[in-house]
Amino acid sequence: MKNTVLTFKQAKEEKRRLSMLTAYDYSMAKIIDESGVNGILIGDSLGMVIKGEDDTLAVTMDEIIYHTKAVKKGAKNALIVSDMPFLSYHVSIEQAVLNAGRLIKEGGANAVKLEGGANVAAQIKAIVDAQIPVMGHIGLTPQSVNAFGGFKVQGKSESAAKQLIDDAVLIEKAGAFSIVLEGIPEKVAELITNAVSIPTIGIGAGKYCDGQILVYQDMLGMFNDFVPKFVKQYANVGNVMREAISSYVKEVQAGDFPEEKHTFKIDENELKKLY
């Protein structure tokens, strides 16, 4: 059954936890979708895990649209949410609505996500008024990495925590259907979750959120050089892939691949005509 914004609303009302993962291409979207997640985010995290950048700031609208198209073809049941990249909604409300519309019309997304609190409430309202569902995102917002001075946990003081709660309430009033809470103390996330009637989706925000989201490369253990504190690795796919590829290389070098069962035949009479 296709997940929609109503699915998310009903899940909170019925106290059912929501699961989300990122995806950036057809193959992974298909596997993730078949595994039963409620939503797939085409995140601007692709700048880091696909392009190898140090942050998300260089990701463009065209790149998000390209990857959204691919994910759309692989995911039949998950709600497809596309990130609005840095500076795609900051300049003006008109710009925000037009770019959100591109993600829906050109990419095929079901909803868009943008970062910020009170400072983007007007953009959220305008996008929602254009009949485009919006997912909010507060806390450690990666597009603000330079303003934060790095990827640092947010909401650790009373004033900062109160600001996050106020931002969440404003985001709900603006019409968002859910909010991502990233990199904030667990108890602060619980307060936010109880303060709003829309579902909260946590990443590094503890167990009291209405749902969880992770970058799939992190939870599958594809990278060994850095594992965020909030990530649980459910597999070590990186090692499995390296071992498989190493075996392939060795077999090719030794002449053991391809075997006879991997090859195609030609009729002997036809073959003789070639000599």
Curated annotation (Swiss-Prot):
EC number(s) from the headed UniProt entry: 2.1.2.11
InterPro entries membership: Pantoate_hydroxy_MeTrfase, Pyrv/PenolPyrv_kinase-like_dom, Pyrv_kinase-like_dom_sf
GO cellular component terms, semicolon-separated: cytoplasm
Enzyme class: transferase
Protein keywords: Cytoplasm, Magnesium, Metal-binding, Pantothenate biosynthesis, Transferase
Positions with a binding annotation for 3-methyl-2-oxobutanoate: 44-45, 83, 113
Note on how the cofactor is bound: Binds 1 Mg(2+) ion per subunit.
Cofactor(s) it depends on: Mg(2+)
Predominant cellular place of this UniProt entry's protein: cytoplasm
UniProt xrefs under SUPFAM superfamilies: Phosphoenolpyruvate/pyruvate domain
Coiled coil: none
Pfam families the record matches: Pantoate_transf (PF02548)
Subunit description: Homodecamer; pentamer of dimers.
Protein name as annotated: 3-methyl-2-oxobutanoate hydroxymethyltransferase
Source organism of the structure: Clostridium beijerinckii (strain ATCC 51743 / NCIMB 8052)
